[in-house]
A protein has these predicted regions:
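Sequence/structural signature of outer-membrane beta-barrel proteins
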Residues: 84-88, 102-108, 135-139, 190-194, ...
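Feature captures outer-membrane beta-barrel proteins of Gram-negative bacteria and organelles
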Residues: 77-89, 113-128, 226-227, 264-274, ...
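Transmembrane beta-strands of outer-membrane beta-barrel proteins
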Residues: 61-63, 97-101, 126-132, 181-185, ...
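Short loop/turn motifs that connect adjacent beta-strands in outer-membrane beta-barrel proteins
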Residues: 47-59, 87-96, 122-127, 177-180, ...
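Gram-negative/organellar outer-membrane beta-barrel architecture
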Residues: 53-63, 68-216, 314-315
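Transmembrane beta-strand segments that form the barrel wall of outer-membrane beta-barrel proteins
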Residues: 60-69, 94-107, 113, 243-255, ...
Length: 381
């Protein structure tokens, strides 16, 4: 399930216009079969035969795409694909694995590739999740800490640089007995390379302290970690009920290949309550913390597409970030008797409110970032 959000935060109003072209397998209304005698088998229409063929197919895929504009990257030509399938096609009780992928081409030069797969194996005894990305884009650096971030001037000469980087971050989850508890290891390998820093960015104190120069900055990180997860969600990719609670820790150290030694600790709590057909109330509390000799690009971010919408990506960064948020989601329920109603059945909306907190340590809060907005949801499967 993919959705597009248009958000308005209390610090800044950002208008995003995203015309999307949706290519999806058609959904057809049930038609009455041709009249038949008592000793004959009713004939199926071409639409019904196609519907049965699609239902039997293991791999389902959908594509979204089109031009857009974002405050971070300007004009963008983007596309998203969603693939779902069962590892064992003959086991209809098995959870469908989900592989979303996104690609964006920046008209000012650059590309962004991202995937966050969820793979479910036999009996849901074993899962492989992860994050995989490649970016080559123009980005901005606003220093470290709320007091610096909120007043830092964004411009070509003060904050802009060219970023190129890759991340490979799989995690492996094993179910403990017959419980909803999973545990397992994770690996995180990432490389960040900053070039073409702005004229005055090279004099920014935290940039210089980290080792940044007029030629840029680069860092390689290799980490090992663990996860302990409780997951009772009905459908992990788009839950309507249940709870998700995730504890994870990472160690990046020189003896396993990292340029610097530092640690990451994250807690992610989410709860879902069904309020009726295709209506759900969801709320979350998250904390992300880093400790040690933290690289310039590995600080905890507050205000990203994955928590508080509407802020510039990467503007607010420090060693600790905390977010609380609640949102109401609803899809339009139609009888799907016409093609218009079938299309409307894929449309919904979301309204949310929340707040972010950031500081140099988990217990010291220096900045508060309020957030609220409304958005559009599009169901592609």
């Amino acid at each position: 399930f993919l959705c597009t959000h248009i958000s308005y935060d209390m610090k800044r109003y950002i208008l995003s216009i995203i015309p999307l072209v949706l290519f999806a397998p058609p959904f057809y209304a049930q038609e009455q079969p041709a009249a038949a005698t008592n000793d004959s088998v009713p004939a199926l229409t071409k639409k019904e035969l196609r519907k049965q063929k699609v239902a039997r197919r293991n791999l389902h895929y959908n594509i979204l795409g089109g031009p857009s504009y974002t405050p971070d990257f300007g004009a963008v030509l983007g596309g998203s694909a969603l693939m779902t399938f069962r590892m064992n096609p003959s086991d209809t009780t098995q959870l469908r694995s989900v592989v979303p992928m996104a690609i964006a081409f920046m008209f000012n030069g650059g590309i962004n590739l991202f995937s966050k797969p969820q793979l479910f194996f036999k009996g849901d005894r074993f899962r492989i999740f992860g994050k995989f990305s490649y970016k080559n884009t123009e980005e901005n650096f606003y220093g470290i800490g709320y007091n610096t971030n909120k007043d830092y001037v964004r411009s070509d000469s003060t904050s802009k640089y060219r970023y190129s980087g890759v991340q490979i971050n799989p995690w492996f989850l094993f179910r403990l007995g017959n419980s909803n508890i999973f545990a397992g290891p994770q690996i995180d390998i990432n490389y960040d390379h900053l070039t073409e820093p702005g004229k005055f960015l090279v004099d920014e104190p935290s940039y210089k302290e980290a080792g940044g120069t007029a030629n840029g900055y680069n860092n390689f990180n290799s980490g090992l970690g663990f996860l302990l997860t409780y997951d009772s969600r009905d459908v992990p990719a788009n839950a309507y009920r249940g709870m998700y609670l995730d504890f994870r820790g990472m160690m990046y150290a020189k003896f396993i290949g990292s340029d610097q030694t530092f640690y990451r600790l994250e807690i992610d709590y989410r709860q879902y309550k069904s309020l009726g057909k295709r209506r759900v109330l969801a709320w979350t509390a998250q904390t992300k913390n880093v400790f040690g000799d933290v690289p310039l690009t590995q600080y905890a971010l507050t205000g990203t597409p994955f928590d508080l919408r509407g802020y510039y990506m990467g503007q607010y960064r420090d060693k600790s970030s905390h977010v609380v948020m609640a949102e109401y989601r609803q899809m339009l329920n139609t009888d799907r008797s016409t093609w218009v109603k079938r299309m409307l059945n894929h449309i919904g909306f979301v309204a949310w409110t929340g707040c972010g907190f950031m500081g140099p340590t988990p217990g010291k809060i220096e900045g508060v970032l309020p957030n609220y907005g409304v958005g559009l949801r599009i169901a592609v499967q």
